[in-house]
Regions:
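Chalcogenol-based redox active-site neighborhoods
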Residues: 1-170
Length: 170
């Protein structure tokens, strides 16, 4: 059983290998981050969803937010996915089951011909410069995901107005 990361909680620092070499680090202090967890190379809706990031490049830059994409895929699968989608953001791979559970993600077993490993269902986390979860969205299916353009508008509002982390009462 997974437990959700509460809004306002410290985001666990996760370090994953990155497509193209090096590592991608999620969590920690000092910057705004948006970590988008996708199901994997086998998911056409993930390709469409993350393919929309390119049109939002300027808005992402203006928000001063680092966007990273994460999956449980292998290096080869993640590299192929990033190339097929034309991703211009860091892509971390090799998310393991313990990390998926730590993030409170739903985990699915593959159907025939999907992939060769269990994988996370979609999740999106906005981490503030204090290293805390500002916004969290976790889904159990590929069909329900937040609109990134609207989310970027919300982040700009949060930054400009000092809007508090919501969902922390009770």
């Amino acid at each position: 059983v997974n437990s959700k990361i509460p809004a306002g909680a410290r985001f666990p620092e996760i370090d994953l290998p990155k497509v193209g070499g090096g590592n991608v680090k999620i969590g920690g202090d000092g910057r705004w981050q948006m970590a988008i967890v996708y199901r994997g190379k086998h998911c056409p809706l993930c390709k469409k969803y993350l393919g929309g990031l390119d049109a939002l490049k300027d808005k992402i830059r203006d928000a001063g937010i680092e966007v990273v994409a994460l999956s449980a895929d292998t290096a080869e699968q993640a590299t192929d996915f990033a190339a097929e989608v034309g991703l211009d953001v860091p892509v971390g791979y090799g998310l393991n089951e313990a990390q998926m559970k730590q993030l409170g993600l739903y985990i699915s077993s593959p159907r025939p011909n999907e992939t060769d490993h269990d994988f996370p269902e979609p999740g999106l986390f906005v981490i503030n410069p204090d290293g805390n979860v500002q916004v969290v969205d976790i889904s159990n299916a590929p069909f329900a995901r937040p609109d990134i353009d609207s989310l970027l508008n919300g982040i700009a509002f949060i930054q400009a107005k000092g809007y508090p982390i919501r969902g922390t009462a009770g």
